[in-house]
Amino acid sequence: MKQPLHIIKIGGNVIDDSEKLSAFLRNFSGIKEPKILIHGGGKIATELAEKMDIPQQMIDGRRVTDAETLKLITMVYGGLISKNIVAALSANGDTAIGLSGADANSVLANKRPANPIDFGFVGDVAAVNSENIDKILQAGFVPVFCAITHDGNGQLLNTNADTMASAIATAMSGNYESFLYYCFEKKGVLEDVENEDSVIPEINPSNYEKLKEEGKIFQGMIPKLDNAFSAIQKGVKAVHILQAEDLSSLILTKRAYGTRITA
């Protein structure tokens, strides 16, 4: 029987709120089975860009990453946010190690084509080195990945953290029973964005299409759900989208929290 591996992506406003992030990391440290954390950090990068007078361009909510912005997000994601998370986890007793996809050649990506939209130094995941990530886990470390990858030729690339989490969970499912969790400030996928209690308990391919047709899945959630379905279809045991504070309760008690994605 394969050993469970928990792959958790933390994002949304939780990263920007020090108290919420600290609470989440305490809960994360309570998970004693092998685990991997993937984090974003867009809001902090945007705030620093304004202070440093680095113009930012967003297209449909996605950041255009020019050369100066790439330097900035590498410093913010791989430096400030990564090291703060690692320091907090170390204080909690976890032997955490902050990584990017370039470290240990963990996540390789292809630069996104300039047509139809040129997003600059943005990469789409091409390969995950599950063998090297497994070596890190076997050595007793807790990998903490920021959403920076590389192209194998020395170029760093900005990569969607949700996609990176899905790709890592999929790659690790060969050796582990992979469980993927998308944690943010909401209780799950909401049928009504104005009603925090309108959590959809389960989404499958059939009701997903229906919910989209009815306009009940807001635009920003669709890429996350697409990544979730991709993971399920490629061998990940289970995918949950839930409130960050409910993570340890879901894993430790097996009770239903948030939205479960099923095939």
Language-model segments: residues:
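C-terminal catalytic "cap/lid" subdomain
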Residues: 1-263
